[in-house]
Amino acid sequence: EALKDADYAVTDDNATDIGIIVGTSEGALGTCCDFQSMITEKGNASGSAFKFPNTVYNAAGGYLSICSGIKGYNVTVTNGAQSGLASMAYAMSVLRSGQENAMLATGSDENSDTMTELFGKLGVTSENVVAPFAGNDGFVLSDGSASVLIEDEKAARERGARIYCHASGYGMAHSNVKFGTLTGSEAGLTNAVNNALADAGMTIDDIDAVFGFANGMKAV
């Protein structure tokens, strides 16, 4: 859908000029657990060679390449709930390096019985509608996927692409806090914002809107 919306046709001539970055937090964890349970209960011989490829994290990237015909850069990254954004940042780095003219950045995760059980035991899920800020009592698990086509600006304009936005910069940082801790992570967030501003050559006064990651997480 992203390629269709961008009116970008993958051909033999440009197949190596476009790459794929997939970001996923849990990947094929459900499939991995099912596969492990099968060989644990029935022995190694029960492991299917047809099912095993679906247990690796980069399975989605491989399938995207096969289905789309894209033959360039193909990498899978995992960075927790930020994996989708990380795929976009990685894609920007590849474009800046000049290795590709376009990158399909995708964020995708599936829910599974394993994830439902895990987060349920941790006590971080909610039985109600997600309340992102005030009254947050946990998040609700679900499937989700989104893709964007990020291009070199010159290449995009030359082909007459419909441009939604210009990605000026990105930043990453980390706070050494345990899962389920809602305080103490401010320094990491501040560093990430400052890094993004520096990368974009902007100041805080240049920012008109801020969109927060708010999944209703509660302290445990």
Question: For each of these PLM feature ranges, what is it?
Answer:
Residues 101-102, 107-112, 118, 124:
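Glycine-rich anion/phosphate-binding loop at the beta-strand->alpha-helix junction
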Residues 3-5, 57-106, 141-161:
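Active-site-proximal alpha-helical scaffold in enzymes
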Residues 123-202, 208-209:
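Condensing-enzyme catalytic core mediating Claisen C-C bond formation in acyl metabolism
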Residues 11-15, 45, 57, 68-70, ...:
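Solvent-exposed alpha-helices and their adjacent loops that cap or buttress functional pockets
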Residues 1-9, 87, 192-200:
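Stable alpha-helical structural segments in soluble proteins, enriched in small hydrophobic residues
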Residues 28-31, 83-87, 111-115, 176-177:
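Short, well-ordered, mixed-charge alpha-helical segments that flank or form enzyme active sites
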Residues 33-44, 96, 117-128:
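A glycine- and small-aliphatic-rich helix-loop capping segment at beta-alpha/alpha-beta transitions
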Residues 1-63, 67-76, 111, 204-220:
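Conserved beta-ketoacyl condensing-enzyme motif
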